[in-house]
């Protein structure tokens, strides 16, 4: 079983992760991310936007099992995070989340 919080932290430290709904949507338009993570309590309009852009870009989506507050805590940030995009996983194995989902 993959520890999502640990792998997310490794990806942030060793790779490139874009944080925030607006920035994630921008990155999806360029097709840069390899994975998008969205909080389970994200509003329907936000989830639909992300799913639409991710489908166009061919990027998999992983729904974080916790709230946006918990996703922020997992990323070691002092604020809520509704969505984030993993552009470069670095040394983490975060892309394996898609295989297990």
Curated annotation (Swiss-Prot):
Coiled coil: none annotated. GO terms for biological process: translation. The keyword Ribonucleoprotein applies. It comes from the Archaea. The keyword Nucleotide-binding does not apply. Pfam families: Ribosomal_L7Ae. One of its GO terms (molecular function) is structural constituent of ribosome. One of its GO terms (cellular component) is cytosolic large ribosomal subunit. This is Large ribosomal subunit protein eL30. It comes from Pyrobaculum calidifontis (strain DSM 21063 / JCM 11548 / VA1).
């Amino acid at each position: 079983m993959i520890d999502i919080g640990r792998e997310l932290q490794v990806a942030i430290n060793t790779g490139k992760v874009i944080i925030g709904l607006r920035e994630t949507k921008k990155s999806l338009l360029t097709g840069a991310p390899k994975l998008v993570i969205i909080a389970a309590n994200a509003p329907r309009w936000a989830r639909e936007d992300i799913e639409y852009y991710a489908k166009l870009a061919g990027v998999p989506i992983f729904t974080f099992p916790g709230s946006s507050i918990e996703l922020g805590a997992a990323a070691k940030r002092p604020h809520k995070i509704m969505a984030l995009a993993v552009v470069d996983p670095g040394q983490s194995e975060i892309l394996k989340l898609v295989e297990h989902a």
